[in-house]
Regions:
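C-terminal/domain-terminus segments
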Residues: 129-163
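Short, conserved clusters of charged catalytic residues that mark active-site
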Residues: 20-21, 68, 124, 142
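Context-gated lysine
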Residues: 3, 9, 24-27, 101, ...
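Short acidic capping loops at alpha-helix termini that bridge into adjacent secondary structure
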Residues: 35, 54, 75, 119, ...
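Flexible, glycine/small-residue-enriched loop-and-beta-strand segment within the central core
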Residues: 44-52, 57-131, 160-161
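Low-complexity, intrinsically disordered short peptide segments enriched in small/polar/basic residues
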Residues: 8, 18, 126, 143-144
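Extended, small-residue-rich solenoid/repeat segments and analogous flexible loops
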Residues: 1-45
Length: 163
């Protein structure tokens, strides 16, 4: 190893150590965590309401918001960068009340619904999966897709507002 390689490794060592500790903490906060689960950088998940199966990769900058309804991710799933999953919604039918003023107690059951990703799936970059969706085993979600309805097993879907 030459001097430049040594200096490069020395400079990056604190960041690598921090990253290992961060991933260990992330896994410990999950409701359930399988083997060989890997997280990209800047991943934000509602940790205590999310279960992840074996051999799952979640790409950089993913945001999984599942505060009031759970998210279940099966085994062998890959998420590209910038994917989002949101298991909740805001109530918009209370006339004269700002959405930010509606309390959790005022939410309806249909405002928060479980998302299930059955396993053996590939979710492309910038995909958005919304509340109440089940993605069947082996299904592929194209980059940039907005998924609002269930996806059958072993299908390939893309585009906005999938039906």
């Amino acid at each position: 190893m030459n001097k430049n390689e040594f200096l490069y490794k020395l400079i990056n060592y604190p960041g690598q150590l921090y990253r290992r500790i961060q991933i260990k903490l992330q896994k410990s906060m999950l409701m359930e965590c399988g083997e060989q689960v890997r997280f990209g950088r800047n991943v934000e998940i509602s940790w205590s309401n999310c279960s992840i199966g074996d051999d799952v990769y979640i790409g950089d900058n993913a945001i999984f918001l599942c505060a009031h309804a759970p998210l279940h991710i099966g085994p062998h799933v890959m998420f590209g960068p910038n994917c989002s999953i949101i298991t909740g919604d805001h109530r918009m039918d209370i006339i004269g009340t700002y959405m930010s003023k509606v309390t959790v107690a005022e939410k309806l059951p249909e405002n928060d619904m479980t998302v299930v990703i059955e396993g053996d799936n590939w979710v492309g970059a910038n995909a958005l999966i919304l509340k109440g969706v089940t993605i069947g085993k082996g299904a592929v979600i194209a980059a940039g897709a907005v998924v609002t309805h269930n996806v059958p097993p072993y299908s390939i879907v893309g585009g906005c507002l999938l039906k």
